[in-house]
């Protein structure tokens, strides 16, 4: 901005609008004032070296970002092209793959592509020991063992994948809750009373660049939430210490809000006021007191009100029977 009116040239590698400086400049300066001259990107060069179709590959960057975010992309038969931070990144990613039962995955480090010192290193995640140059792009072909962790991006991860004190939105209820929150690319969720963060984590996994803020007054539960976010590939979960509604002051307006506990009229009014147009609100109630509040709000605002009860097969002596969980009353609506 200080140089406005003069011709300024910014040199960037590859395509400046693909995980590069061009996007940041475009947010600070009107794109009408900028002329971009893209060259071959690291992704294009890497795909050509590997013989992979770009249409069938997930591209991501961990350059200057938490490397754990690639965990969410570990899927059987998935091909990944990853911009790394440096020489240690491939070893870290090999460790993530091996820990999750993907040790047979094929890794290829492509260093200094297009230059005089171009080099290639091939190996399996479980035996990766190469010392590679710092300027590299990593190609991964994910190969799952029989005991591999199956972590789909759709909501409904197994409860045992989450650290916690037992107070959490359980698997089947969580799946319906996140579905009704409608995760979308780049959208922001407030998880009010987030506990171990299971809903926020599933929301962030379900859509690329989805964001979430978890509001939780208990330090131990915030620790659980942070650990779960890291382990499940969404390390950018933001956690706020505080009580609702005061903790909501000055937060960015959300596209969706989940209230899993501690419902009150004051909490609802603060959330509803902050929710953006076309925003989604989902509230789960277990107690009679919370259910009564939901009934009153439903009568005033409409939406969808459902009761969900899950029963699971359990051994009863030598036979098997159904053991029901506590019913959950779920209210969802869209702000129009």
Task: Go through each PLM region and give its residues.
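Class I SAM-dependent methyltransferase SAM-binding "motif I" and its flanking Rossmann-like core
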Residues: 13-77, 245, 255, 299-320, ...
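C-terminal substrate-binding/active-site "lid" region of AdoMet-derived donor-dependent transferases
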Residues: 268-332
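Short beta->alpha hinge that forms the Motif I/post-I loop of the SAM-binding pocket
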Residues: 216-221, 286
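Class I S-adenosyl-L-methionine
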Residues: 1-35, 44, 209-216, 226, ...
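A contiguous loop/helix-start segment that scaffolds small-molecule binding in enzyme catalytic cores
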Residues: 6-8, 76-166, 304, 308
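Short alpha-helix immediately C-terminal to the canonical SAM-binding loop
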Residues: 222-223, 291
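Conserved class I S-adenosyl-L-methionine
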Residues: 186-195
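Conserved SAM-binding loop of SAM-dependent methyltransferases across substrates and taxa
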Residues: 196-208
């Amino acid at each position: 901005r200080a140089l406005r009116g003069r011709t300024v040239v910014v040199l960037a590698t590859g395509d400046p609008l693909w995980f590069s400086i061009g996007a940041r400049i475009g947010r600070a300066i009107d794109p009408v004032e900028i002329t971009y001259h893209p060259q071959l990107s690291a992704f294009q060069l890497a795909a050509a070296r590997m013989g992979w179709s770009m249409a069938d590959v997930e591209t991501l960057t961990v350059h200057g970002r938490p490397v754990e975010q690639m965990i969410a992309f570990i899927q059987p038969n998935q091909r990944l092209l990853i911009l790394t931070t440096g020489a240690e990144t491939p070893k870290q990613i090999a460790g993530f793959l091996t820990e999750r039962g993907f040790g047979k995955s094929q890794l290829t480090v492509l260093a200094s592509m297009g230059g005089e010192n171009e080099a290639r290193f091939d190996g399996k995640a479980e035996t990766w020991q190469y010392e590679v140059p710092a300027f590299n792009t990593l190609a991964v072909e994910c190969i799952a063992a029989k005991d591999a962790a199956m972590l789909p991006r759709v909501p409904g991860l197994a409860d045992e994948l989450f650290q916690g004190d037992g107070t959490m939105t359980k698997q089947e209820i969580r799946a319906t809750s996140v579905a009704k929150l409608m995760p979308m690319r780049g959208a922001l969720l407030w998880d009010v009373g987030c506990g171990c963060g299971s809903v926020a984590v599933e929301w962030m996994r379900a859509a690329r660049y989805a964001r979430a803020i978890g509001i939780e007054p208990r330090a131990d539960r915030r620790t659980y939430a942070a650990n779960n976010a890291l382990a499940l590939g969404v390390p950018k979960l933001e956690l706020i210490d505080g009580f609702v509604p005061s903790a909501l002051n000055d937060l960015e307006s959300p596209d969706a809000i989940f209230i899993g506990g501690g419902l009150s009229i004051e909490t609802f009014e603060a959330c509803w006021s902050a929710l953006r147009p076309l925003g989604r609100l989902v509230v789960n109630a277990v107690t009679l007191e919370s259910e009564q509040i939901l009934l009153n709000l439903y009568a005033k605002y409409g939406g969808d009100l459902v009761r969900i009860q899950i029963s699971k097969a359990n051994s009863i002596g030598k036979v098997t029977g159904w053991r029901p969980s506590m019913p959950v009353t779920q209210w969802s609506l869209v702000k129009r």
